[in-house]
Amino acid sequence: PKYLELVAEHPSVYDAIEGLAFSPSGFFQTEYDRLFASHFGKKPIYRRIIRLLSDNPYGLTVSRIAAELGIAAGGSLSRQLDDLESAGFLHAMIPFDKPDNSKLLKYVLIDAYVRFYTAIIRGEQRTQTMPGTQFRALMSSPSYRSWLGRSFEYLCMQHHREISRILGFEGIPYRVGPFFQRKNLNAPGVQI
């Protein structure tokens, strides 16, 4: 609700994003730091996990997260991943074609603001454009279009129940999730 209230104060969504996300004093410029301070204090491991997952938008397994961060894949990491999942920042995904107890599990960053901040706002802080034109320039970039497509995919997965109701198949059993397969002797790795 807070984000929607902030957007409603502007004449258009475009103006809101430009002002809130790309002006130096914009609310979304500092919201990332506020979120982590309020949820996790000054524990840097949580930011490191989020940054790693933001750089890997299709998710990572626990073993890959541990290897990339140079930490053990044991209890502490599991607890930190659980904390981030409980806070709504990430979600453990099982491929839709696997049983619920599958060991093939990936953690994916699902918080819409954090995904936008890490992929778009933080990335745009490194570029120089005229004030008030950053979002316009960004909207035509391939990286933005790629982010937009993934965001639509995440939105659909998060709201699959409403989508199934609207499309009229809510009474039919179905599974939701990404399709990914590990590379093996018979098949290359793939992510859909």
What residue ranges belong to the model's regions?
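Short amphipathic alpha-helical interaction segments
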Residues: 70-88
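Short hinge/gating elements
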Residues: 33-36, 62-64, 99-100, 134-148
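A cross-kingdom feature that marks ATP-driven nucleic-acid transaction machinery
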Residues: 105-192
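Hydrophobic residues on short alpha-helical segments
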Residues: 46-54, 157
